[in-house]
């Protein structure tokens, strides 16, 4: 299975409860950013620049857990910054496991090997390592030599210890797709559990020269989709069709709400117009109708999984052929 049975069961149960209750807008994945400090300055990441004035702020553990409880999403993505720099990261993960949340611990992998002792393998924890190319390319994007080798060493140690590990690859304008194919087969050969791939987001604070426009995304993902059946790709087939320009999907910005030291980030993980103090305020005060392709120019080229995979989850039960395609894909 592409995803563990326990995760499929949790999501199905959660979706059923939301639909029975009549809720139209509800979160699927909480993006929890306990800090924005990082040990790298990656070329495609706008987080450090966006939160430069508060880069040293760290979220107290009890505040992080309150956000998890207030949101109620069945999945929590612990990100940043580099979450392995967060001092109580072991306690945070343990508390999330105790709450039976499915966790994606997102890391650049530099500190992974030495941090494994803080965690224990279990069905709720997935370690998600960013890898944007083979060694030379990935080190260049990361701004430091040796990053790729450290990440791979950490991945191998984590898999040997029994942890579930997946990777996340951002695709840029200059990405060499044959190199990405080589990377994905390399990851499969070291027994990775899954691979995510998505076009990098065009942050306002970064140079737009490195990012894909919509047409370029279609071309790049035609190739990635063509190799996906041979690999443990976790991007859903409906999302891949969207990336190829073969399927229309509307963004679901509330599907992956973000909480950090400034509060609840509105409207989405990628765009910041304001921060709200409470989750309820985020959901009720954000004018969701203002955002999306053709509505806000910042959304023009965005095809990120954080906005569109939640749409797939919301839509899949409405069409039998989509539902069956997802079932077959998940079991292959």
List the model feature ranges, each with a label:
Residues 59, 125, 130-132, 140-256, ...:
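Radical SAM enzyme [4Fe-4S]-AdoMet core and its adjacent flexible, acidic
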Residues 51, 82, 133, 201, ...:
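Flexible, active-site-proximal loop/turn residues at the rims of small-molecule/cofactor binding pockets
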Residues 52, 113, 136, 175, ...:
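Generic structural signal for helix capping and beta-alpha/helix-loop junctions
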Residues 2-118, 122-123, 315, 325, ...:
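Conserved alpha-helical substructure of the radical SAM core
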Residues 232-332:
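Accessory C-terminal segments flanking Radical SAM cores
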Residues 48, 79, 130, 198, ...:
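Conserved residues at the C-terminal ends of beta-strands
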């Amino acid at each position: 299975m592409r995803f563990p049975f326990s995760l499929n069961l949790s999501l199905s149960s959660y979706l059923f409860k939301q639909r029975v209750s009549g809720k139209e807008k509800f979160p699927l994945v909480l993006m929890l950013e306990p800090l924005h400090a990082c040990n790298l300055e990656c070329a495609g990441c706008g987080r450090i620049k966006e939160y430069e004035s508060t880069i040293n702020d760290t979220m107290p553990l009890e505040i992080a857990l309150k956000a998890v409880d207030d949101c109620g999403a069945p999945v929590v993505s612990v990100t940043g910054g580099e979450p392995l720099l967060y001092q109580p990261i072991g306690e945070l993960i343990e508390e999330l496991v105790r709450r039976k949340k499915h966790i994606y611990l997102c890391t650049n992998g530099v500190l992974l090997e030495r941090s494994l002792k803080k965690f224990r393998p279990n069905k709720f924890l997935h370690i998600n390592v960013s890898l944007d190319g083979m060694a030379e390319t990935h080190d260049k994007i990361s701004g430091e030599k040796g990053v790729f080798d450290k990440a791979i060493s950490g991945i191998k140690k984590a898999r040997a210890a029994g942890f579930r590990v997946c990777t996340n690859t951002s695709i840029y304008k200059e990405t060499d797709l044959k190199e990405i194919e080589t990377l994905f087969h390399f990851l499969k050969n070291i027994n990775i559990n899954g691979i995510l791939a998505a076009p990098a987001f065009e942050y306002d604070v970064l140079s737009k020269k490195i990012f894909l426009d919509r047409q370029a995304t279609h071309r790049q993902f035609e190739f990635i989709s063509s190799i996906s059946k041979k690999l443990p790709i976790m991007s859903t087939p409906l999302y891949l069709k969207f990336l190829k320009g073969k399927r229309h999907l509307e963004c679901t910005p509330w599907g992956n709400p973000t909480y950090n030291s400034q509060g609840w980030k509105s409207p989405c993980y990628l765009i910041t117009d304001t921060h709200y103090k409470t989750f309820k305020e985020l959901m009720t005060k954000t004018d969701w109708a203002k955002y999306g392709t053709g509505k806000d120019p910042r959304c023009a080229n965005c095809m990120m999984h954080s906005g569109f995979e939640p749409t797939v989850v919301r839509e899949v039960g409405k069409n039998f052929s989509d539902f069956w395609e997802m079932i077959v894909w998940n079991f292959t």
